[in-house]
Amino acid sequence: MALNLCTSPKWIGTTVFDSASSSKPSLASSFSTTSFSSSILCSKRVGLQRLSLRRSISVSVRSSLETAGPTVTVGKVTEVNKDTFWPIVNAAGDKTVVLDMFTKWCGPCKVIAPLYEELSQKYLDVVFLKLDCNQDNKSLAKELGIKVVPTFKILKDNKIVKEVTGAKFDDLVAAIDTVRSS
């Protein structure tokens, strides 16, 4: 049995068993297509005719890296963009989601950023996101109705339920507690 592997970083492993050997299955770590081909040579007693059979099977395996959406780490703030924001919010389901809408040039945004990071470590049942309201994400910022930075949007069940504008840490904590307890 011949085994041909084509490598590609977007395809990831499968277990392959070579029936020609008695070895255990092995793990092929990176591949896009696996082709198995086997030749069977049979001889009949009458006339010693030979039969050649060739069979090819192509198997494609999708990587969980390609099919999975953006990931969020508990206890960390995840930076999102216009393409990743809604998939993460949808995946959060009924969890509370807090979005920090900031810009890199905003002084109050820089002041509250480390405190926001601490909140993500305190509230492990809440998803903490941040969105840089630059030109690339302008459409999402407009969709979410941003007027000033920083603005914190608190979402539950894919809907904005609270908003805190400005670097008002105590107001943000109170809003998060209110939404979590509802």
UniProtKB/Swiss-Prot annotation:
Annotated site (Deprotonates C-terminal active site Cys): 100
Boundaries of the annotated transit peptide in chain numbering: 1-69
GO cellular component, one term: chloroplast
Annotated site (Contributes to redox potential value): 107-108
Active site: 106 (nucleophile), 109 (nucleophile)
Keyword Cytoplasm: no
Residues covered by the Thioredoxin domain: 70-181
Keywords noted in UniProt: Chloroplast, Disulfide bond, Electron transport, Plastid, Redox-active center, Transit peptide, Transport
Localization terms from the record: Plastid, Chloroplast
Superkingdom field: Eukaryota
Cystine pairings recorded for this chain: 106-109
Record's function text: Participates in various redox reactions through the reversible oxidation of the active center dithiol to a disulfide. The F form is known to activate a number of enzymes of the photosynthetic carbon cycle.
Family: Belongs to the thioredoxin family. Plant F-type subfamily.
Subunit structure, as described in the record: Forms a complex with heterodimeric ferredoxin-thioredoxin reductase (FTR) and ferredoxin.
Protein name, per record: Thioredoxin F-type, chloroplastic
Organism listed in the record: Pisum sativum
